[in-house]
């Protein structure tokens, strides 16, 4: 009797053939830890619009009624959704606005009523809030005091929208130059990287040309000198500003530098020294100016006050000591970037001047999309974390390596070869053995030290990834408090308890950046220190000596 084909079938094949059908599962539904279900086809936070991933056509870009001007309403909403323009559209806005800026004087004259605004620093979503508080640019005159770019991650959107407004309202929207509107700072901070990430180097270079065209100061209502930084020992009359050749990269000293970089003294109004100007050691360039220096300048030029930006303020503004002759504040600082760098927790403000009445309007920060540091993608950002853990695993594996495992390795290495060699003498054998032991000991040392260096490099890279706010520790150790880095950005925010803490932490980033050659030298030195730091690591040293001695003695 012959067996049928089913009787000869392998039990495993039969089990596969007769397996129960898998239960149906809807992969478009994801069950969260709390038991709630969400669709994988929908946005989890539905009230946040999806990013605009398309480049607009020229029909969308240009206004219907004014075909040579960009559509402001479209631009505003497109940038809110993180949309980008074509290279041609971007350059059109920059170049057309630059032509208007070039035609303006170094010292422009602005009548009242006007709304004066301080630093913006790439906080586009807060800029939209500013216009809600300050008024529609279509029927409100604005004077911006500079620093539109850097530090924030939406600088190019701020620039393009403000430049588009300048095209529409060339006689009612005024833009002054800040210290960040230059090649040196935008290369050092984030703006150049942002331009090349979102657009290309051609757009960045067009922005630099536009920065050189920005006016340096303004006389508002024939009463107020408005400028980004402040006064200078070389500034005696308003004609001194008019005589500057502004169409260049700002120098590191002189009148143009001081207009962009100078600050009032910390004890402004209660100075113990009679000096009008002293070196600004906080900025690394320019000067601190005194109350008496401001009063003297105002009297000599028949002005009421100086209005400037340049310094973050806890409540968005600061009024300084009043002059003896007019009883009006000699100096005012206005800052319009709320919760600066997402860690300062400060309010922002704009100054509205109308009918000889000055009002301060404050506002808080608005939600905005999150960017990883330096516009990194999540895979690049996570590599140092993975690398650090892998190197830690290698060191841990060395720590649990047993003497028997080392002995087995020795037996394999010392296994006899097929070719017979003449037997060496006893002295030669002993000398060769000592040389071989020392050589193997050095090889082991080098391998473990290499792992230590790799571990240290990944550790430093990981700390840089987590230090998203570019802040340095106030204690001067260049490291955040113990445990803070393990909590990432939230840990950094929690470690900063006040506005003053944030300013102290960020003080190094307020200085004039070093030159490119000095930066390269500093980076090289820092890399060498990182590579050498493993040699000073006692745990690595102990591991090296223990295993080198153990293995060489077997």
Swiss-Prot record:
Fe cation binds at residues 119, 121, 147. It is an enzyme of class 3 (hydrolase). It catalyses: O-phospho-L-seryl-[protein] + H2O = L-seryl-[protein] + phosphate; O-phospho-L-threonyl-[protein] + H2O = L-threonyl-[protein] + phosphate. SMART domains: PP2Ac. Residues 415-426 have a biased composition (Polar residues). GO terms for molecular function: calcium-dependent protein serine/threonine phosphatase activity; calmodulin binding; calmodulin-dependent protein phosphatase activity; metal ion binding; phosphoprotein phosphatase activity. Binds 1 Fe(3+) ion per subunit. GO terms for biological process: calcineurin-mediated signaling; cellular response to calcium ion; fungal-type cell wall organization; intracellular calcium ion homeostasis; negative regulation of calcium ion import across plasma membrane; positive regulation of mitotic actomyosin contractile ring contraction; positive regulation of mitotic division septum assembly; regulation of cell morphogenesis. One of its GO terms (cellular component) is calcineurin complex. Transmembrane segments: none annotated. Zn(2+) binds at residues 147, 179, 228, 310. The active site is at residue 180. Its EC number is 3.1.3.16. Signal peptide: none annotated. Keywords: Calmodulin-binding, Cell shape, Hydrolase, Iron, Manganese, Metal-binding, Protein phosphatase, Zinc. Its cofactor is Fe(3+); Zn(2+). InterPro entries: Calcineurin-like_PHP_ApaH (IPR004843), Metallo-depent_PP-like (IPR029052), MPP_PP2B (IPR041751), PP2B (IPR043360), Ser/Thr-sp_prot-phosphatase (IPR006186). It holds the Pfam family Metallophos. Residues 411-433 are annotated as: Disordered. Calcium-dependent, calmodulin-stimulated protein phosphatase. This subunit may have a role in the calmodulin activation of calcineurin. Appears to be involved in cytokinesis, mating, transport, nuclear and spindle pole body positioning, and cell shape. Belongs to the PPP phosphatase family. PP-2B subfamily. Composed of two components (A and B), the A component is the catalytic subunit and the B component confers calcium sensitivity. This is Serine/threonine-protein phosphatase 2B catalytic subunit. It comes from Schizosaccharomyces pombe (strain 972 / ATCC 24843) (Fission yeast). The gene is ppb1.
């Amino acid at each position: 009797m012959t067996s049928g084909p089913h009787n000869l079938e392998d039990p495993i094949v039969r089990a596969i053939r007769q397996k129960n059908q898998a239960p149906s599962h809807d992969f478009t539904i994801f069950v969260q830890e709390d038991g709630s279900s969400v669709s994988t086809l929908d946005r989890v936070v539905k009230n946040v619009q999806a990013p605009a991933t398309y480049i607009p056509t020229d029909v969308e870009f240009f206004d219907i009624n004014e075909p040579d001007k960009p559509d402001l309403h479209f631009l505003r909403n497109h940038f809110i959704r993180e949309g980008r323009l074509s290279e041609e559209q971007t350059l059109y806005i920059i170049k057309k606005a630059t032509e208007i800026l070039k035609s303006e004087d170094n010292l422009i004259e602005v009548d009242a009523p006007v709304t004066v605004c301080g630093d913006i620093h790439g906080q586009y979503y807060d800029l939209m809030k500013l216009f809600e508080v300050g008024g529609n640019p279509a029927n409100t005159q604005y004077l911006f005091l500079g620093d539109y770019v850097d530090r924030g991650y939406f600088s190019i959107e701020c620039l393009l929208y403000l430049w588009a407004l300048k095209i529409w309202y060339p006689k009612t929207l005024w833009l002054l130059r800040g210290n960040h509107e230059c090649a040196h700072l935008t290369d050092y901070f984030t703006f150049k990287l942002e331009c090349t990430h979102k657009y290309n180097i051609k757009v960045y270079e067009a922005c630099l040309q536009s920065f050189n065209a920005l006016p340096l100061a303004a006389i508002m209502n024939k009463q107020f000198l408005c400028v980004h930084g402040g006064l200078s020992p070389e500034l005696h009359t308003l004609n001194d500003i008019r005589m500057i050749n502004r169409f260049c990269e700002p120098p590191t000293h002189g009148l143009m530098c001081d207009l962009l970089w100078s600050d009032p003294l910390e004890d402004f109004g209660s100075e113990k020294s009679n000096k009008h100007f002293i070196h600004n050691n906080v900025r690394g360039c320019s000067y601190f100016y005194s109350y008496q220096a401001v009063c003297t300048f105002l009297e000599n030029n028949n002005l009421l006050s100086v209005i400037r930006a340049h310094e973050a303020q806890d409540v968005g503004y600061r009024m300084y000591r009043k002059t003896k002759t007019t009883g009006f504040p000699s100096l005012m600082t206005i800052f319009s970037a709320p919760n600066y760098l997402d860690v300062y927790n400060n309010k922002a403000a704009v100054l509205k001047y109308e009918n000889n009445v000055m009002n301060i309007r404050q506002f808080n920060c608005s939600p905005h999309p999150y960017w990883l540091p330096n516009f990194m993608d999540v895979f690049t950002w996570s590599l140092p974390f993975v690398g650090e853990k892998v190197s830690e695993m290698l060191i841990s594996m060395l720590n649990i390596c047993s003497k028997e495992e080392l002995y087995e390795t020795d037996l394999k290495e010392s296994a006899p070869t097929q070719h017979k060699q003449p037997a060496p003498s006893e002295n030669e054998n002993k000398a060769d053995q000592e040389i071989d032991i020392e050589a193997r000991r050095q090889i082991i040392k080098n391998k473990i030290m290499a792992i230590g260096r790799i571990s240290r490099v990944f550790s430093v890279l990981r700390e840089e990834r987590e230090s998203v706010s570019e802040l340095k520790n106030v204690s001067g150790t260049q490291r955040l408090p113990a445990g803070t880095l393990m909590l990432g950005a939230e840990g950094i925010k929690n470690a900063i308890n006040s506005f003053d803490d944030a300013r102290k932490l960020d003080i190094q980033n307020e200085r004039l950046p070093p030159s490119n050659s000095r930066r390269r030298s500093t980076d090289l030195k820092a890399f060498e220190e990182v590579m050498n730091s493993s040699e000073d690591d006692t745990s690595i040293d102990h591991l090296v000596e223990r295993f080198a001695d153990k293995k060489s003695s077997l």
